[in-house]
Regions:
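Beta1-alpha1 glycine-rich phosphate/pyrophosphate-binding loop at the start
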Residues: 7-69
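FAD-binding core/adjacent interface of flavoenzyme oxidoreductases
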Residues: 1-12, 66-132
């Protein structure tokens, strides 16, 4: 894919919040790029549900449809996507360096939105499973 190197806004993170932010910026007429280290949009919440959950609730198809809808919304709103890109440096002036299997790319933007989300890190301690 041939990317422009300069954008009005770059969003780091293609989860629900990042996609929403990118859509809002695009609707205001900005040229937007969304960067994510995953192979598609959706974020951590769609990464890997427990197998027992998928078997009981058959949610994997629904989650794939949500990812497809995210991607369709981004494409329809002329938002560039850089999937499988890991951000390794953000310099003053919003110079964003990413890398993937093809090498390093430097992007620049007037605005930067960091929507990388979160995931739980369990730190066990005595009594940590006790309610209250």
């Amino acid at each position: 894919m041939d990317f422009k190197k300069e954008y009005d806004t770059i969003v780091i993170g293609a989860g629900p919040s990042g996609v929403k932010a990118a859509l809002k910026c695009s609707k205001k007429g900005q040229k937007v790029l969304i960067i994510d280290s995953n192979q598609n949009s959706g974020g951590q919440i769609y990464r890997a549900p427990p197998k027992s959950y998928v078997k009981k609730n058959n949610k994997s198809l629904e989650e794939n449809l949500i990812q497809i809808k995210f991607s369709e919304h981004l494409k329809k709103n002329n938002i560039d996507t850089a999937y499988n890109h890991t951000v390794w440096q953000v310099s003053p002036g919003f110079k964003i360096n990413t890398f993937n299997e093809e090498g390093v790319i430097e992007w620049s933007a007037k605005n930067l939105i960091v929507a990388t989300g979160t995931y739980e890190k369990i730190i066990p301690f005595e009594g940590w499973t006790t309610p209250g």
